[in-house]
Amino acid sequence: MSKLHTLVDICMVPLGTSSPSVSDYVTKIEKRIRESHLKSTMHSFGTTIEGPWDEVMSLIGQLHEYSHELGYVRIHTEMRLGTRTDKQQTAQDKVDVVEKKLSDY
C-alpha cells in the first residue's frame, strides 16, 4: 500500500436525474466520506479529502459503487489531486500559508 500523502478535491454529480438539484445526493455522499477515517472538508463545489493515496482512491471507488447502489446509472466525477514528498502538508496548511502572505502584504 502506498503511504504517499494525497490531497484530492472531488466533485461527484449524478447525471440523468429528474431534478436539477443534487443536494440529497451530496448529503448521502458527504455522510459516507465523514464515516471514513480520512480528513475531509466540504465546500460549495465539492469536498477535499486527505490521506494516504491508496486509502483516498479506495474511498473514491467506494463512493462510486455506493452511488450506483443508490440507483444512479451515471456518475460524473471531477478530481484535482496533489502529492508531495518533501513534507506532509494539509489542505488547511496550504490556505494558512497564503493567508499569512496576504496579511504581510
Swiss-Prot record:
One of this protein's Pfam families, by short name?
Thiamine_BP
Query: Which top-rank group of organisms is this from?
Result: Eukaryota
Similarity remark: Belongs to the UPF0045 family.
- Name this protein carries in UniProt: UPF0045 protein ECM15
Q: Which gene encodes it?
A: ECM15
